[in-house]
């Protein structure tokens, strides 16, 4: 992989917030993902790259999607502070925060606008969950024409199978898959 063009590349970190990271994940724990993602955030900000921290939140629950489904959406508990970014990334300067109300980070946010205004054509994606927030954002990014790099060891899912499926069958159709060390070497 060639070096990343920092001025045209953004790191997009999905849902590394207290209420999501605390859940059970595989193949990596929330703690492992936070450790890798925080290294990426620090490295990207040190190089002056655009870093976007995305979280899901609700004002009163009425602003969230509620479609009719065959299976129940696994509702996360929402104690006070559930939607706060984890401390490892919450106080890093020069990051841009986006709040979404659904799985993907594009719909209903200004993510595309902010990326285009900065001349960004490549997104490096990480976060939780591989098969929900990261995957949906990746599909939306693909539809918007962005190049994508998925940091496989800086994301995780509810199960090994979900993570493996998305990384094996979906992400290769949308972009390139790398690990944290490979990305850090390309900065």
From Swiss-Prot:
CDD domains: cysteine_hydrolases. It is an enzyme of class 3 (hydrolase). Its EC number is 3.-.-.-. Keywords: Hydrolase, Plasmid. InterPro entries: Isochorismatase-like_dom (IPR000868), Isochorismatase-like_hydrls (IPR050272), Isochorismatase-like_sf (IPR036380). SUPFAM superfamilies: Isochorismatase-like hydrolases (SSF52499). The keyword Cell inner membrane does not apply. GO terms for molecular function: hydrolase activity. Pfam families: Isochorismatase. Belongs to the isochorismatase family. PANTHER family: ISOCHORISMATASE FAMILY PROTEIN YECD, PEROXYUREIDOACRYLATE/UREIDOACRYLATE AMIDOHYDROLASE-RELATED. This is Uncharacterized isochorismatase family protein CA_P0030. It comes from Clostridium acetobutylicum (strain ATCC 824 / DSM 792 / JCM 1419 / IAM 19013 / LMG 5710 / NBRC 13948 / NRRL B-527 / VKM B-1787 / 2291 / W).
């Amino acid at each position: 992989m060639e070096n990343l063009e920092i001025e045209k590349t953004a790191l997009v970190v999905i849902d590394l917030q207290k209420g999501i990271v605390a859940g059970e994940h595989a193949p990596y724990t929330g703690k492992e993902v936070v450790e890798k993602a925080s290294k990426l955030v620090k490295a990207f900000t040190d190089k002056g790259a655009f870093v976007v921290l995305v979280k899901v939140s609700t004002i009163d629950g009425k602003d969230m999607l509620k479609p009719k489904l065959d299976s129940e959406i696994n509702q996360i508990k929402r104690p006070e502070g559930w939607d706060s970014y984890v401390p490892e990334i919450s106080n890093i300067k020069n990051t841009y925060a986006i709040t979404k109300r659904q799985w993907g980070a594009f719909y209903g946010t200004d993510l595309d606008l902010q990326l285009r205004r900065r001349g960004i054509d490549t997104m490096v994606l990480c976060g939780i969950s591989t098969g929900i927030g990261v995957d949906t954002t990746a599909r939306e990014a693909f539809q918007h024409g962005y190049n994508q790099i998925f940091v496989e060891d800086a994301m995780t899912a509810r199960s090994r199978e979900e993570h493996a499926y998305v990384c094996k069958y979906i992400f290769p159709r949308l972009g390139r898959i790398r690990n944290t060390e490979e990305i850090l070497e390309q900065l």
